Amino acid sequence: MLFRSRRFLRENPNVEVLFREKMPAMQMALLERRELDAGIWRMATEPPAGFTSLRLHESAFLVAMPEEHHLSSFSTVPLEALRDEYFVTMPPVYTDWDFLQRVCQQVGFSPVVIREVNEPQTVLAMVSMGIGITLIADSYAQMNWPGVIFRPLKERIPADLYIVYETQQVTPALVKLLAALAQ
């Protein structure tokens, strides 16, 4: 997706692209007020009526844990093995935590959240201190987080990125962007 985005920006220098970091609910509100042409967030699989979502990037959630954690020797971690763990998360308004709670409940447990913070970097800092574990998109494992190890889950939990837009308000620039990102 990164290379496709770069190419789009290079090939369309007259298209003004503004990046505004907003939580999914805020992006949706901006889309509904037509103050935003498109939003990008994880797991936008069921947009409201009149909106379309297009998957841009396939991704999965991993478990992040302190290096010395008792599950660190596992090459893949069954979700059920997290039943008695303490979790550090972000509030549901900032992240996919409601979705992840439902996934955990489907295998028979409700995660015990010991801390909620607003930034993923703070979540991982707390994990490195041994405060708890977290479920986080695999893109975070590409960065160096001292004291934290990432393990795939035995059950794939999607963390796919989607672009969301109003079906009847597609601008020529958005058509070009969608075409570039779909390649």
Kindly give the residue locations of the regions a language model identified.
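Ligand-binding cleft/hinge of the Venus flytrap
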Residues: 4-13, 97-110
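Secondary-structure junction motif
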Residues: 42, 86-107, 171-175, 179
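A ligand-binding cleft/hinge motif common to bilobed small-molecule-binding domains
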Residues: 25, 32, 36, 40-50, ...
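Conserved functional loop/turn residues at catalytic and ligand-binding sites
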Residues: 16, 30, 34-35, 55, ...
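Short beta-strand->loop
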Residues: 52-62, 134-139, 146-160
